[in-house]
Amino acid sequence: KGTDKNYDLTLVDGSLDIAKAKINQVTGITADHRTYDATTNATLNTVTAQFEGIVVGDQLTVATATGKFNDKNVGTAKHVAINNISLSGTDSNNYDLVKNTAQTTANIGKANINSITGITANSRVYDGLTDASLNIANTQFNGLYSGDQLTVATATGQFESASTGQNKTV
């Protein structure tokens, strides 16, 4: 009803559209620190994600996201690009994600070489010393990732004693 007695107000049924709200960006995604594994893959933690533009009381979570370090090498506070962020949660159908990328940092620590094999001592003539010259041409590093290369920079060896003998321990 209107407030003017000179008019009758007639309401007509109609339809309206309610547009989705926009999440401008997702922040708070972190990457786990990890040990070197010859890849740029980063494991993400989305539990602390925050959604810029969410209506108070709505429930959103990160459905998917991928993380990549800029390179595979060891380092601290390395840049991690976060891509392909998508939303889930009870109220996710009410939102469009404007920016599906983010960034963070994480550390890559050194990997361990489990063992080194293939280094042999060269036979020699008795000289009263225990020094052994080593052949490193066939060195193998157990724990080395495919595609990576390591070499032995220096190696020293000592015979268990200076006396002559066969199959002596070095």
Locations of the language-model features?
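Short loop/turn motifs that initiate or flank beta-strands
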Residues: 1-170
